[in-house]
Curated annotation (Swiss-Prot):
<dbReference type="GO" id="GO:0005524">
    <property type="term" value="F:ATP binding"/>
</dbReference>
<keyword id="KW-0067">ATP-binding</keyword>
<comment type="subunit">
    <text>Homodimer.</text>
</comment>
<dbReference type="InterPro" id="IPR044140">
    <property type="entry name" value="ProRS_anticodon_short"/>
</dbReference>
<keyword id="KW-0436">Ligase</keyword>
<dbReference type="Pfam" id="PF00587">
    <property type="entry name" value="tRNA-synt_2b"/>
</dbReference>
<keyword id="KW-0648">Protein biosynthesis</keyword>
<dbReference type="GO" id="GO:0005829">
    <property type="term" value="C:cytosol"/>
</dbReference>
<keyword id="KW-0030">Aminoacyl-tRNA synthetase</keyword>
<dbReference type="Pfam" id="PF04073">
    <property type="entry name" value="tRNA_edit"/>
</dbReference>
<protein>
    <recommendedName>
        <fullName>Proline--tRNA ligase</fullName>
        <ecNumber>6.1.1.15</ecNumber>
    </recommendedName>
</protein>
<dbReference type="InterPro" id="IPR045864">
    <property type="entry name" value="aa-tRNA-synth_II/BPL/LPL"/>
</dbReference>
<dbReference type="InterPro" id="IPR036621">
    <property type="entry name" value="Anticodon-bd_dom_sf"/>
</dbReference>
<dbReference type="Pfam" id="PF03129">
    <property type="entry name" value="HGTP_anticodon"/>
</dbReference>
<comment type="function">
    <text>Catalyzes the attachment of proline to tRNA(Pro) in a two-step reaction: proline is first activated by ATP to form Pro-AMP and then transferred to the acceptor end of tRNA(Pro). As ProRS can inadvertently accommodate and process non-cognate amino acids such as alanine and cysteine, to avoid such errors it has two additional distinct editing activities against alanine. One activity is designated as 'pretransfer' editing and involves the tRNA(Pro)-independent hydrolysis of activated Ala-AMP.</text>
</comment>
<dbReference type="InterPro" id="IPR050062">
    <property type="entry name" value="Pro-tRNA_synthetase"/>
</dbReference>
<dbReference type="InterPro" id="IPR002316">
    <property type="entry name" value="Pro-tRNA-ligase_IIa"/>
</dbReference>
Length: 571
């Protein structure tokens, strides 16, 4: 491809609304352009990268035995009402009506549509297991689209759905998808981690996320420094560092604590170690009209997913208002604790091992100091309620936990029978009896992968594409292309490289574009290999080569270039 026949739309300045580096570089390199909030047009350069991601995803899904389909982006409301998600999904679901006042939505995901397809096409156990996938545009009406492709409203996703008669069959396909995803992200050249995850609103049981490691990632991922244990922050099990509760050394006493509504104020005002304080948070209970107190140590954070999974707690999690708290307990936030607490209470494992701790007295502006379980109050229900912190013991007993930032690019779920039961999807078993099918769900954020790759691979000059993703493999940059000798040598080399199957961008812009600008553009775009053809080099029988990740260029004899490039690109 020649730049004279191509849309090369690089920008010198970074647009003001671009915050993260991937958004900045995608705009500056002329790969995408903003149409509206969270909506982007893919320009030719960016589309080449996107298609490469799609190709690798498609190849590995096909190799794993999945069957490609393409489902409508617009979905009838009746299907979502059948599954119960029409109301549950919330404002992110873009709803619309046609001219006949029939309700539809623009699909953020396709569980309902694929379940409807399956119940119309599958009728016998002999057709199972089966795994369908598509690569398609989705839409979620994010309240604050941000970070370019990282969190847009419209995005491209590969979603797959498998159907099974048994849990064992699902597990086999799930394991196959786990391996396929690992191959996909390895082929894409990304440093990634698969981690245990919570299924969230999509439902079901087992789940893994695939994260690209990057300091700019939105998610905390947790893994052991001595084993294969890995989970996201929502799922990671928090194991107390203490093996047993310490002995009581203080008497419990009631202390005036005026204007002490936060842990920081309690610690600073009374010279308490933060490890000797607790936080009491009040949420709605599973039983209508009830409240439940959740207690974590002062230096720990409540894990809302773990909290919502407690049988006593309403899901989704709803925090009680101050008015509700005062009506039920007689004191407000900042003065709450487990002593004489008139509502149900669950404490975190670390709290259960505390001694001589400080807690709100459920009396305004008062705390109890020197509180000890069993002596001063019975130990309530104990559960894992908190986020892990770096240095916690690994749940598998091997090593300690490390926390890094990650960008979620893939997620696989074991859905169970949630959708098949709701939408009456069943087939006849070998015994001739109807059986609800067990489902799996497997997603990859295809357009997000492009942004994640940049977040992980860039420098001060631009993008450092993994070789599998670069829009072009080779940039040919002639100096004074209008010179006959340079033009002939460049055109000959371009023909040889393209004939050999290499993807080449020939920068044949005229002399108004300086060599420095050409070099800067090729580095910004992230083309891995640059070859410079000059009159001086030709007179010496050499061409200048520079790898995008190299600090220095080198001269190569013209006759050796093809073998050199072939060897470089075969790695």
């Amino acid at each position: 491809m020649r730049t004279s026949q191509y849309l090369l739309s690089t920008l010198k300045e970074t647009p003001a609304d671009a915050v993260v580096i991937s958004h900045q570089l995608l705009l500056r390199a002329g790969m995408i352009r903003r149409l509206a909030s969270g909506l982007y047009t893919w320009l030719p350069m960016g589309l080449r990268v996107l298609r490469k991601v799609e190709t690798i995803v498609r190849e590995e899904m096909n190799a794993a035995g999945a069957l490609e389909v393409l489902m409508p982006a617009v979905q009838p409301a009746e299907l979502w009402q059948e599954s119960g998600r029409w109301e549950q999904y919330g404002p992110e679901l873009l709803r619309l009506k046609d001219r006949h006042e029939r309700e539809f939505c623009v699909g953020p995901t396709h569980e309902e549509v694929i379940t409807d397809l399956a119940r119309n096409e599958l009728n016998s156990y002999k057709q199972l297991p089966i795994n369908f996938y598509q690569i398609q545009t989705k839409f979620r009406d994010e309240i604050r689209p941000r970070f370019g492709l990282m969190r847009g409203r419209e995005f491209i996703m590969k979603d797959a759905y498998s159907f099974h008669l048994s849990q064992d069959s699902l597990q086999q396909t799930y394991d196959g998808m786990y391996q396929a995803y690992s191959k996909i992200f390895s082929r894409l050249g990304l440093d990634f981690r698969p981690v245990q995850a919570d299924n969230g609103s999509i439902g079901g049981s087992g789940s893994h996320e695939f994260h690209v490691l990057a300091n700019s990632g939105e998610d905390d991922i947790v893994f052991s420094d001595s084993s294969d244990y890995a989970a996201n922050i929502e799922k990671a099990e928090a194991v107390p560092r203490e093996s047993a509760r310490g002995s009581a050394t203080e008497d419990m006493r009631l202390v005036d604590t005026p204007n002490t509504k936060t842990i920081a104020a309690l610690v600073d005002g009374f010279q308490l170690p933060i490890e000797k304080t607790i936080k009491t948070l009040v949420v709605h209970g599973a039983e209508e009209g009830t409240l439940v107190a959740l207690i974590v140590r002062g230096d720990h954070e409540l894990n809302e997913i773990k909290a919502a999974n407690q049988p006593l707690v309403a899901s989704p999690l709803v925090f009680a208002s101050e008015a509700e708290i005062r009506a039920a307990i007689g004191a407000g936030p900042g003065s709450l604790g487990p002593v004489n607490l008139p509502i149900a209470c669950i404490v975190d494992r670390s709290v259960a091992l505390m001694s001589d701790f400080a807690a709100g007295a459920n009396i305004e502006d008062k705390h109890y100091f020197g509180v000890n379980w069993e002596r001063d109050l019975p130990l309530p229900e104990v559960a894992d309620l908190r986020n892990v912190v770096e240095g916690d013991p690994s749940p598998d007993g091997k090593g300690t936990l490390v926390i890094k930032r990650g960008i979620e690019v893939g997620h696989i779920f074991q859905l169970g029978t949630k959708y098949s039961e709701a939408m009456k999807l069943s087939v006849l078993s070998e015994q001739g009896k109807p059986v609800n099918l067990i489902m799996g769900c497997y997603g990859i954020g295809v357009s997000r992968v492009v942004a994640a790759a940049i977040e992980q691979n860039h420098d001060e000059r631009g993008i450092l594409w993994p070789s599998a993703l670069a829009p072009f493999q080779i940039a040919l940059v002639p100096l004074k292309y209008e010179t006959e000798s340079v033009k002939q040598a460049t055109d000959k080399l371009y023909a040889e490289l393209t004939a050999a199957g290499f993807e080449v961008l020939l920068d044949d812009r005229d002399k108004k574009t300086s060599p420095g600008v050409k070099f800067a553009d090729m580095e910004l775009i992230g083309i891995p290999h640059r070859i410079v053809i000059s009159d001086r080099g030709l007179s010496e029988g050499v061409l200048e080569y520079k790898g995008r990740r190299d600090s220095e260029s080198q001269n190569l004899p013209i006759g050796e270039l093809m073998s050199f490039i072939t060897e470089k690109l075969s790695r």
